[in-house]
Amino acid sequence: NSPIMMFTVYTCIILISWIGAKMIVVNSLTTGELMSLLTYCMNIMMNLMMLSMVFVMITMSIASAERICEVLNEKSDITNPENPDHEVTDGSIRFDHVTFRYNKTSDTPVLDDINLSIASGETIGIIGGTGSSKSSLVNLISRLYDVSEGAVYVGGKDVRSYDLDTLRNEVSVVLQNNVLFSGSIFDNLRWGNPDATDEQCRHACDLACASEFINRFPDGYNTHIEQGGSNVSGGQKQRLCIARALLKNPKILILDDSTSAVDTATDAKIRKAFAEEIPNTTKLIIAQRISSVMNADRIIVLNNGVVDGFGSHEELMETNAIYREVYESQTQGSGDFDEGGAK
């Protein structure tokens, strides 16, 4: 509507000026009166334009409000059981013949007959090609989705028996593209634990190798972070998010390709700190780089939603063709996992 309105305004100005000029020539209108007339007309036209914009905004607001109400009124399929458990005893995980579909009517499962047993405190690497359902696998642990068949057990109990808040408070997830909020570094860290002391925040940052760059800031931990973390690098953002997750003191820590923007030396320091400082926390590390998982206790190789291999680095090098192919491609300077192998 803006070009049409502007065309109308300028057309009115031209007509008033043209007619007014003729009237001035025959002395039926003064120059001052013409200028006043133009000013009044401009004010009227501008107010009409504002009014039309208000109507447009109201229409857009009503449509947005309807969509928001639809989301707020949506009922979640995942709810608490009648008598939920409020304590997760340890970080052990077991997948018992788990099959999962995003669409219940789909014939092809995303995960098919997964059987895994992970002891509390183990460090487990997970690798696989794009679309091999690595993230889908770990999302079942905190009940972001429910299994289609089988069951997932945490601490020896079916995850569906837990209170949702209790379960999710014991599972920390660090994604590849996490979010930082506007505020100081301390403020961002305390999203993981509002009651954390300054010393606990500093210790978490030491484990995540974030203190290395924080101490170089003039304001240290009081440095202001812009919305979305736009004033820190990708690697710095990932390390802050890892520190934030550690502050929850979870029984299960999931790192979903969360060190992809971190150099290999820093990545190794973080993994070493995890092994020494949080030995009782079960750690699941999803990665594309073999170097990020090769020192894990065991490694899961996923291929098209099926466990293709599960064992230590040495065992998989001997028995699993996909793992061996990716390892060889990366040690020769290639890089990323692709469907069913290396790219």
Describe each model-derived feature in a short phrase:
Residues 10-13, 80, 86-343:
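ABC-type nucleotide-binding domain
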Residues 1-66, 71-72:
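Helix-loop-helix
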Residues 20, 27, 74-77, 91, ...:
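Flexible, glycine-biased helix-capping/connector loops in cytosolic signal-transduction modules
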Residues 70, 77, 190:
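Conserved E/DxxT/N motif and adjacent residues on the DHp alpha2 helix
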